[in-house]
Amino acid sequence: MPVVRVSWFEGKDAKAKKAVAAEITDSIVKHAGTDPKYIYVIFEDIKPSDWAGAGRLYGEEPGTP
C-alpha cells in the first residue's frame, strides 16, 4: 500500500492536485505493478513562512536579516 506525501507551498487548486495524484498513481502502477485502489497520495499545503531552505524562511523578503 504505497502512500505518497506531497509537501508544497499552499495555493494549488483541486485541478492541479488531481493531475499530480493521477501522474503519481500511474507511475506507481507502471513501475511497481500496484493496484491503483491501494495507492494513496496525501497533499500537505504549507505556508511559505513555515518552510525554510538554506537557513531562510521562504516567506521572507529578500535582504531580510
UniProtKB/Swiss-Prot annotation:
Enzyme class: isomerase
Family: Belongs to the 4-oxalocrotonate tautomerase family.
Record SUPFAM superfamilies: Tautomerase/MIF (SSF55331)
Catalytic center residues: P2
Keyword line: Isomerase, Plasmid
EC number: 5.3.2.-
Pfam families: Tautomerase (PF01361)
Domain of life per record: Bacteria
Name this polypeptide is given: Probable tautomerase RSp1151
Positions in coiled-coil regions: none
Keyword Lyase part of the UniProt annotation: no
Matching Gene3D superfamilies: Macrophage Migration Inhibitory Factor
Organism of provenance: Ralstonia nicotianae (strain ATCC BAA-1114 / GMI1000)
One of the record's GO molecular function terms: isomerase activity
